């Protein structure tokens, strides 16, 4: 399953036409006029090679100009930064041997031009009143804002449910880490719930881009719900990664799991470097302590790294005296006391079943 946000070409095109942008204002004007239109954004020289005839405009772009020029039958060619209208009423002559799945003349041309040049091509259907964006081999149909809002709100509700389940799993893991009772199952469960949250988040992030200026509220809700989940996911990998696989590589492997594979917790165990046999899921394992230590306010990453490297695991850090903590590079007596008190306070919060 390809993450929409990983497709940089379409992401760039989508941001360019998101609500609130000058280009989207012009496209909306054309939609309301029901004239249809074909707009090419000349991001490279290949575009100009297939432009024939028309009028050389070379004027500053404005939504009203786009609306007026779209009344003519030909294509409108804009500069790569959408600051200038280069040509109007132009004929586009792409290679007609390029395959296209479209039926209408305007959209067949748009798809061929996009495939041949890699440029962003926008087709506005006169009858269906729909905006379609093409870039390379990709195609995207722009949905109505109200529909996107409905989908975004539904996704936010789903995320709230997933996040509640994740928070319960993390709270449980916190208690187990402080009491040195963590098993592979506990870690795999948290990893699974985190990935489920991240997948819903990716969908909402796509909606936020589609909503443009209108998506501010959805974006704020998303950030509020997510909290430190993105950081915690990386730190859990650092805490329990048995084979010291690169974190980015590990995250990529988790992201590439399909829905059926994600349900099976043994797959998470395998990614961490454990056997993956269901009977070994109850095997006790120890955390390195990156995630818990990161919760101590204003404790630098370099100090956390020194602590983890000095002690074998988090339990040893937890049991260490102030004098033993003081021996770690970069930690003086004041900071050692601060770390010790911070860990004691967090352990008390965990016993009270509170989030840290």
Swiss-Prot record:
Catalyzed reactions: 2 ATP = 3',3'-c-di-AMP + 2 diphosphate
Binding site for ATP: 74, 92, 105-109
GO MF annotations in UniProt: adenylate cyclase activity; ATP binding; diadenylate cyclase activity; DNA binding
NCBIfam families assigned to the protein according to its UniProt record, in alphabetical order: PRK13482.1
Complexes and interactors: Homooctamer.
Enzyme Commission identifier(s): 2.7.7.85
Top enzyme class: transferase
Protein species of origin: Clostridioides difficile (strain 630) (Peptoclostridium difficile)
Protein name: DNA integrity scanning protein DisA
Assigned protein family: Belongs to the DisA family.
InterPro entries named among the record's database cross-references: DisA, DisA_sf, DNA_integrity_DisA_N_sf, DNA_integrity_scan_DisA_link, DNA_integrity_scan_DisA_N, DNA_integrity_scanning_protein, RuvA_2-like
DAC domain sequence ranges: 7-147
Cofactor(s) demanded: Mg(2+)
Any Gene Ontology biological process: DNA repair
The protein's role, per its UniProt record: Participates in a DNA-damage check-point that is active prior to asymmetric division when DNA is damaged. DisA forms globular foci that rapidly scan along the chromosomes during sporulation, searching for lesions. When a lesion is present, DisA pauses at the lesion site. This triggers a cellular response that culminates in a temporary block in sporulation initiation. Also has diadenylate cyclase activity, catalyzing the condensation of 2 ATP molecules into cyclic di-AMP (c-di-AMP). c-di-AMP acts as a signaling molecule that couples DNA integrity with progression of sporulation. The rise in c-di-AMP level generated by DisA while scanning the chromosome, operates as a positive signal that advances sporulation; upon encountering a lesion, the DisA focus arrests at the damaged site and halts c-di-AMP synthesis.
Keywords: ATP-binding, DNA damage, DNA repair, DNA-binding, Magnesium, Nucleotide-binding, Nucleotidyltransferase, Transferase
């Amino acid at each position: 399953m390809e993450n929409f946000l990983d497709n940089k070409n379409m992401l760039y095109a989508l941001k360019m036409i998101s609500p609130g942008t000058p280009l989207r204002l012009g496209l909306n004007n054309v939609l309301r006029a029901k004239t249809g239109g074909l707009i090419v954004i000349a991001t490279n020289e290949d575009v100009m090679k297939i432009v024939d005839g028309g009028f050389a405009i070379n004027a500053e772009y404005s939504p009203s100009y786009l609306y007026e020029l779209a009344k003519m039958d030909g294509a409108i060619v804009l500069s790569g930064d959408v600051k200038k209208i280069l040509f109007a009423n132009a004929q586009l002559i792409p290679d007609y041997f390029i395959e296209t799945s479209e039926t209408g003349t305007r959209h067949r041309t748009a798809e061929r031009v996009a495939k041949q040049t890699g440029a962003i091509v926008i087709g506005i259907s006169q009858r269906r009143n729909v905006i379609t964006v093409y870039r390379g081999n990709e195609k995207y149909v722009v949905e109505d804002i109200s529909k996107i809002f409905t989908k975004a709100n539904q996704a936010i509700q789903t995320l709230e449910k997933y996040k509640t389940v994740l928070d319960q799993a993390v709270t449980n893991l916190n208690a187990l880490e402080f009491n040195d009772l963590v098993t592979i199952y506990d870690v795999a469960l948290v990893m699974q719930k985190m990935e489920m949250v991240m997948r819903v988040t990716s969908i909402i992030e796509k909606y936020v881009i589609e909503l443009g200026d209108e998506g501010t509220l959805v974006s704020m809700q998303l950030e509020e719900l997510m909290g430190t989940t993105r950081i915690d996911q990386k730190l859990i990998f650092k805490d329990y990664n048995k084979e010291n696989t690169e974190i980015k590589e590990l995250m990529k492997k988790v992201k590439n799991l399909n829905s059926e594979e994600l349900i099976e917790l043994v797959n998470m165990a395998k990614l961490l470097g454990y056997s993956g046999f269901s009977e070994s899921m109850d095997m006790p394992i120890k955390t390195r302590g990156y995630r818990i230590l990161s919760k101590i306010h204003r404790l630098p990453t370099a100090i956390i790294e020194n602590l983890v490297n000095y002690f074998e695991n988090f339990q040893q850090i937890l049991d260490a005296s102030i004098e033993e903590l003081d021996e770690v590079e970069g930690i003086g007596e004041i900071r050692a006391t601060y770390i010790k008190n911070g860990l004691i306070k967090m352990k008390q919060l965990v016993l009270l079943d509170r989030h840290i």
